[in-house]
Amino acid sequence: MTAARNIPTFDDLPLPADTANLRHGANLHDALLALLPLVGVWRGEGEGRGPHGDYRFGQQIVVSHDGGDYLNWEARSWRLDEDGQYEEPGLRETGFWRFVSDPEDDPSESQAIELLLAHSAGYVELFYGRPLTQSSWELVTDALARSRSGVLVGGAKRLYGIIEGGDLAYVEERVDADGGLVPHLSARLSRYAG
């Protein structure tokens, strides 16, 4: 059912269209093969912890490419009420995944994952990490910049993985005021397209 779906495109641009379906469009760049399972449109629900307590949210993540040496990332979420219905817009982020020369110069690994994200809440985050397996990836914040109007946040650690049933699951921990990592977000998303 998801194999025929893709993201909408306009065919009047003189460059390859973005695709979230590996069966359509440009071939995935060879440098991104370790991230291939992420490509697609993912939808589902998760749980978050904020300053006003725990909450549930819905989410869509679009991971697409145009044949370049990076993946496009767009995540949109919305708060859910106690009945699981839409309540209000939630977190939104957009960015790029790519492989780069290892910033740590680790002799056992020559490449690191770089994830650059801009958040609608007014901050930009740079993560570095590695594949843990063929279908799981761990990333940690390396740098964070906040706009004048942006929310104050600490760094984060994210773990993504393709789990039983082919779903995408992730957990994010954020640094709290005491300097420790605490649970912040987790979700399980099913493939909607790709």
UniProtKB/Swiss-Prot annotation:
EC number: 5.99.-.-
Keyword entries, A-Z: Heme, Iron, Isomerase, Metal-binding
Catalytic EC class: isomerase
Motif (GXWXGXG): 40-46
Chain positions recorded as heme b binding sites: 157, 184
Catalytically driven reaction(s): peroxynitrite = nitrate
Organism lineage string: Bacteria, Bacillati, Actinomycetota, Actinomycetes, Mycobacteriales
Subunit structure: Homodimer.
Keyword Metal-binding belongs to the record: yes
Top-rank taxon, per record: Bacteria
GO MF annotations, alphabetized: heme binding; metal ion binding; peroxynitrite isomerase activity
Co-factor binding comment: Binds 1 heme b group per subunit, that coordinates a highly solvent-exposed Fe(III) atom.
Function: Heme-binding protein able to scavenge peroxynitrite and to protect free L-tyrosine against peroxynitrite-mediated nitration, by acting as a peroxynitrite isomerase that converts peroxynitrite to nitrate. Therefore, this protein likely plays a role in peroxynitrite sensing and in the detoxification of reactive nitrogen and oxygen species (RNS and ROS, respectively). Is able to bind nitric oxide (NO) in vitro, but may act as a sensor of peroxynitrite levels in vivo.
Cross-referenced Pfam families: THAP4_heme-bd
Domain notes for this protein: Forms a 10-stranded antiparallel beta-barrel structure able to accommodate a hydrophobic ligand in its interior. In fact, this fold hosts the heme group, which is located in a wide surface cleft.
Coiled-coil positions: none
Known cofactor(s): heme b
Pathway per the UniProt entry: Nitrogen metabolism
Keyword Hydrolase: no
Record's protein name: Peroxynitrite isomerase 1
Family, per entry: Belongs to the nitrobindin family.
